[in-house]
A protein has these predicted regions:
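Short beta-strand-initiation
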Residues: 8-9, 139, 170
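A solvent-exposed, acidic/Ser-Thr-rich amphipathic alpha-helical stretch
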Residues: 48, 68-142
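Short beta-strand edge/turn micro-motifs at domain boundaries
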Residues: 30, 146-154, 158, 162-197
Length: 198
């Protein structure tokens, strides 16, 4: 006759089976509280707010220059870049409107700062786009794409100066949503609208 040895694993399984069969099952045993959630998806509302923030930042640099000169404008631009762009994490794909080779692209914060306020001998062609007397900034989107924690927009930005003249630029942005919920620019391409020769 073959004998089955009562190994610890068999004993444990038997006890567990007995407990499960004898214990009354209730719905309460399986109830859990509201689950904690983490959502890293960027929303359209967040993108639109980030665009408004960019316009507000540009106007604040212009206002700082008008009221306090270059030093105040540079300090303000530093803050705007830290809040709006992701330079603290690495290079940003930034192609400003009015830059020329060999400094067309501005992947570093220093290059972006020079474009916005000028005054950097390493970027001698920059005169300070953001210190011009801008009074209004309006974003007009043609495309908004949402891809998880990233979003890309394409459209126009209309800038109005103190005399009421409007400058329109073609604008493409890519935004990233940080774990803390903040939205920053990782790609910024800007150019003047193309006019075909007649």
């Amino acid at each position: 006759m073959r004998h089955l040895r009562a190994t610890p694993s068999r004993i444990g399984f038997g006890l567990l089976s007995a407990l499960l069969l004898s214990a009354p099952l209730s719905a309460k045993a399986f109830q859990v509280g509201t689950p904690l959630r983490m959502d890293t998806n960027i929303t359209e509302a967040q993108v639109l707010e980030a665009q408004k923030g960019w316009c507000k930042g540009l106007l604040s640099i212009s206002e700082a220059y008008a009221s306090g000169g270059f030093a105040k404008a540079k300090a303000t631009a530093n803050q705007v870049l830290d809040q709006a762009y992701a330079y603290q994490y690495g290079p940003v794909a930034f192609k400003p409107t009015l830059t020329v080779s060999p400094q067309t692209f501005r992947p570093t914060k220093a290059g972006a700062l020079a474009y916005f306020v000028g005054g950097d001998p390493n970027f001698p062609n920059d005169t300070g786009f953001a210190i011009k007397p801008w009074k209004n900034c309006m974003v007009r989107n043609q495309v908004i794409q949402l891809h998880g924690m990233f979003a890309t927009t394409m459209g126009n930005v209309e800038l109005t100066n103190e005399k009421g003249a409007i400058t329109t630029v073609d604008k493409t942005w890519t935004f990233i949503r940080e774990p803390d919920g903040s939205i920053r620019i990782v790609l910024h391409h800007s150019s003047l609208p193309f006019s075909a020769a007649k």
